[in-house]
């Protein structure tokens, strides 16, 4: 089976690494000449709206999937004429636009911060008055890793904020005094079978994920599964989806979904019986899903901007290095380390060792 992937970054790379043992081959459509997944399959170098090369991809593969959600709707519609596409167009339409996403949460009865559509500075002024400050102004599309957003703490911050984000459609979200950030990675098969990985505790730095620690018997696991299950069923979703939540007053409030394999699920490569990457491929290919059970105590640390010396990273016991082969650049995810340990105390010690290498 040959899988087409829109995007050739590290997520596409890790999909290929997981799919090769299953006998799968890959073709990546990505305009970047240095796409880091290119060495693991065919690289069709073209823009995401280039219909000639999209048709070439469709003709060569058995199905198409995505490594990011900001795919032009026209691209999805065009590909769907010629080849199965997973996840479906509706899933991408909802997930790429924060207004549609938040509206879906509300329709499904999933708690989420107060929000308002912002199409102008006047809209922002009215929304800030209604929701109150502090609040977060976000572009409706394209923002990720802390980009495309601005925290508004006082009235002076509101003035000119719409222009600061490019005068594009935005959403204002009420600030949530959360006690923690967690995410749930789930996988849904073509026949609707659904499996969930353990909830993960996430730590961010300047909006970029820094550390994910897989939980054991989290008291909110069942609630998170309920909320995620509602979304998967509504979208008739196929593949892996990640749902990020805020922990608030002993419950959960929805932050956002990602209709793809997700950074907070990287720990599953060594820390679960079947990784998120393999399970995504199993789902879209119509294969039986793998077990999402955790193996040992696991965590993932991102390498942002640079990877510490390889010899030092692999010298840490229970540590597995994943180097993306990308040029080092401030703010860029260029690799990660996964840790799988026998117990929680050992895991915390190993996290501290890797953090020391990152900070050195």
Swiss-Prot record:
A GO molecular function annotation here is: 5-(carboxyamino)imidazole ribonucleotide synthase activity
**Swiss-Prot/TrEMBL keywords:** ATP-binding, Ligase, Nucleotide-binding, Purine biosynthesis
Region forming the signal peptide: none
* ATP-grasp domain ranges (all copies): 102-285
GO terms under biological process: 'de novo' IMP biosynthetic process
* Record's keyword annotation contains ATP-binding: yes
A Gene Ontology cellular-component term = cytosol
Residues in coiled coil: none
| Binding-site residues for ATP, renumbered to this chain | 98, 138, 143-149, 173-176, 181, 204, 255-256
The family database entries (PANTHER family) matched by this protein are listed as: PHOSPHORIBOSYLAMINOIMIDAZOLE CARBOXYLASE (PTHR11609:SF5), PURINE BIOSYNTHESIS PROTEIN 6/7, PUR6/7 (PTHR11609)
Quaternary arrangement and interactors, per the entry?
Answer: Homodimer.
Give the protein's biological function.
Catalyzes the ATP-dependent conversion of 5-aminoimidazole ribonucleotide (AIR) and HCO(3)(-) to N5-carboxyaminoimidazole ribonucleotide (N5-CAIR).
Q: Which family does it belong to?
A: Belongs to the PurK/PurT family.
Protein name as catalogued: N5-carboxyaminoimidazole ribonucleotide synthase
Q: Which organism is it from?
A: Pseudomonas aeruginosa (strain ATCC 15692 / DSM 22644 / CIP 104116 / JCM 14847 / LMG 12228 / 1C / PRS 101 / PAO1)
The root-end lineage is: Bacteria, Pseudomonadati, Pseudomonadota, Gammaproteobacteria, Pseudomonadales
């Amino acid at each position: 089976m040959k899988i087409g992937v829109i995007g050739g970054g590290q997520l596409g790379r890790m999909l290929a690494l997981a799919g090769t043992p299953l006998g799968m081959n890959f073709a990546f459509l990505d305009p970047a000449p240095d796409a880091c997944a290119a060495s693991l399959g065919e690289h069709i170098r073209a823009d995401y709206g280039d219909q000639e090369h999209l048709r070439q991809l469709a003709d060569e593969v058995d199905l198409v999937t995505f490594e990011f959600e900001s795919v032009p709707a026209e691209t999805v519609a065009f590909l769907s004429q010629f080849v199965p596409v997973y996840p479906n167009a509706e899933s991408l339409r909802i997930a790429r636009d924060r207004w549609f996403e938040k509206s879906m949460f509300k329709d499904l009865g999933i708690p989420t911060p107060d929000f308002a559509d912002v199409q102008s500075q006047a809209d922002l002024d009215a929304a800030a008055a209604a929701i109150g400050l502090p609040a977060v102004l976000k572009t409706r599309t394209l923002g990720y890793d802390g980009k495309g957003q601005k925290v508004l703490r006082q009235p002076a911050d509101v003035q000119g904020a719409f222009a600061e984000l490019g005068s594009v459609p935005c959403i204002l979200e009420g600030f949530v005094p959360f006690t923690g950030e967690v995410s749930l990675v789930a996988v849904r098969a073509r026949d609707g079978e659904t499996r969930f990985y353990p909830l993960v505790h996430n730590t961010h730095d300047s909006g970029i994920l820094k550390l994910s620690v897989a939980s054991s018997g989290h008291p909110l696991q069942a609630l998170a599964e309920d909320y995620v299950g509602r979304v998967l069923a509504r979208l008739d979703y196929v593949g892996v989806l990640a749902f990020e939540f805020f922990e608030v007053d002993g419950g959960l409030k929805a932050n956002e979904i990602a209709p793809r394999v997700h950074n907070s699920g990287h720990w599953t490569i060594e820390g679960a019986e079947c990784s998120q990457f393999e399970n995504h491929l199993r789902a879209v290919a119509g294969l039986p899903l793998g077990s999402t059970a955790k193996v040992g105590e696991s965590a993932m640390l991102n390498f942002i901007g640079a990877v510490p010396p390889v010899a030092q990273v692999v010298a840490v016991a229970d540590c597995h290095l994943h180097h993306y082969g990308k040029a080092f650049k401030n703010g860029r995810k260029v690799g990660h380390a996964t840790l799988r340990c026998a117990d929680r105390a050992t895991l915390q010690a190993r996290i501290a060792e890797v953090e020391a290498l990152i900070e050195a």
